[in-house]
Amino acid sequence: MKQIRLLSLCLLLCTVFASLKAQVNTQFDGDYSGTAYNIKMKGKLKPSQKMVFRLHNGVLTGAVPKIGKMPGTILFSIKGISISSDGTMKTSAPNAGSIKMMELFNSTLYWDNTVKNEAPFYGHVQQVNGTNVLTLRLNIYSKVAGLFRVPASVSFKGKSQRPAAKK
């Protein structure tokens, strides 16, 4: 009888914790309009530009259109996003999305672990004056024709287009 009660308690706690995790992840869901800045392609700084990132059900998406001699549009699709109680974001995704080149083919975006003193993915979301604010730093690379490593990085700060969820 004690084992059944203990098992029931464990199941109840698992359900509660799973529910809390889902609430933490979805309370920040929304479209974040802001500025992509510190955009670097092959180490060369590109101009800042307006863009939107969408966070929905643990997936972060956004697109950086072709800039200058970039081979195409960078399409971020970062899955497995979790948000801790302090707003720190983590991902379990093995890659960051793709780059669509010349409207013909896609190349995978990999996390770049070689950038000095920076993690390949940094994300933070918080409420500021009743509005959700998203801050990102993404260090990535792609392989052109599977041979040439092309590094890139982008930072982003934006505000949610919907009011922050009440705590």
What would you call each of these model-derived segments?
Residues 23-46:
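Tryptophan-anchored aromatic micro-motifs
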Residues 45-121:
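Predominantly extracellular/secreted and cell-surface proteins with exposed
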Residues 33-39, 65-70, 99, 139-145:
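Hydrophobic lipid-interacting interfaces of membrane-associated proteins
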